[in-house]
Every structure is written in structure tokens, then in C-alpha cells.
Amino acid sequence: MQIILPGIVLTHSPAEKQHVIAKIFSPAGLLSAFAKNGASLSCDFRESLLPISFSLFTIQHTPPKMRKVLQGELKNPFTTIKNSYRLLQSTGKMIQAILKTQWQEKPSPQLFSLFLNFLQRIPETPHPYFFSSMFLLKLLQHEGSLDLSHSCTLCKSSLESSTVYRHEGSLFCEKHAHEKTILFSQEEEQILRIIVQAKKFQELMCLAEFPIDIDSKIDSLFSSFLTEKMNVLP
């Protein structure tokens, strides 16, 4: 069976000879696909297989064999990202987040669209690392692992006008905070909620114009989510 689908190459690794195995994120989820002679200069779609490239792929799927890339039409090579260390570092953070949270072949059309939009806009922001942290928050929201209530998970006391503590997917008051919780001031919590509730990219772009020092806390929050995820795996 042959299918045509859009996809963003997250990673690729060499196979024997000049073959390539690409990890592609698409609306159909994470896919691993084999490209015969994909690293060869004679391959007319070689550039479409490079990491951080958006392409339209023709893929052959004959279970139980691995998917095979028959053709790739490069749509966006994201050259600006590849030519900047800061942008590469920030984009790499988003890629690793996807690789660590998404199941193989689990359809994620909304997350795919979100990631593609972030890739298209990250070169426009003066603070790409903060912008990539916004993606981590959006990913937590997508996974249903971000408590947006206004009360402590344990005692249900109101947190609307106070400092809050977050860990994994939960929200805590000062009394029930523990050594692994991450403190968010009232202002930081407000910014977090603005990011999560933003419906338009322009809102995120406006926030990313300012050097808001919250990205390290968002990254730590995401790391705690990954720890929780690993602990529940069989």
C-alpha cells in the first residue's frame, strides 16, 4: 500500500551502504521509514530526508516490513534554523520533547500542526529558547498533564491569589509543597496560563518579544512530567 503524507524529519540514522532510516513526525504520528540510498548524492530526494525538513512523502507500507520512502518532495528545509546555533538548540529541545512523549504511529494531527507552526515562527522571535519552552507547555496541555484549576490537588484550597507549586501534572499549595515541586510566583503562573490559553500564534509571538525568565521552570516542569511518564510505563 502506498500513502502520501506530510512529515517533518526529526532524526535520521545511517543504515548499511548509503541507506537511511528516518524518524518522521506526521499527522499519523511518529513513523520510522527506510530510504534506499537516501544518503547518496544520486538520491533525488536526499535533502527531504535531512533532520528539520518538512516534506511531502510517498511511503510504501507492507506489514510487517518497515515503511519505505519512495519519494520526498521538499517543502521547507528550514535553512534559517539550520544556520543558527541558538535556533538549532531551541528546535532540538522541541524535537526531543516529541520523541520522548509520542508513541509510534499514534495519530497526532493537532500536535503536528502545532509543531510545524512553531518551526515556521521560531526564526522570527528574539528569544527562541523561551519560545521553545512555550511549545513544551503546549505539549503538556496536549497530553492532558497540566492542572489549570485554581486549587491545591490535595487540600483543594484556593490558589488564585498566591504563589503556587507545580510537580508533574499537579498543583500544590505552600503547605503541601515538597522538595521536588517547582515554585511559580503569582506573575509567573499568570504568564504560564496566558501561554497555555493562547488561541493565536500572534499572542505567543508578542510574549516571546520579552526576555521573561520562566523558561527554566517550564523546562523543569516538563522534565518532572517525563519522569512520571517513565515511572508508569510497564
From Swiss-Prot:
GO CC annotations on file: bacterial nucleoid
Taxonomy, superkingdom: Bacteria
Keyword field: DNA damage, DNA recombination, DNA repair
One of the GO biological process terms: double-strand break repair
Keyword Coiled coil carried by entry: no
Gene3D superfamilies recorded: Recombination protein O, C-terminal domain (1.20.1440.120)
InterPro entries on file: ARFGAP/RecO, NA-bd_OB-fold, RecO, RecO_C
Cross-referenced HAMAP family: RecO
Family of this protein: Belongs to the RecO family.
Function text: Involved in DNA repair and RecF pathway recombination.
Name of this protein: DNA repair protein RecO
Gene this chain is encoded by: recO
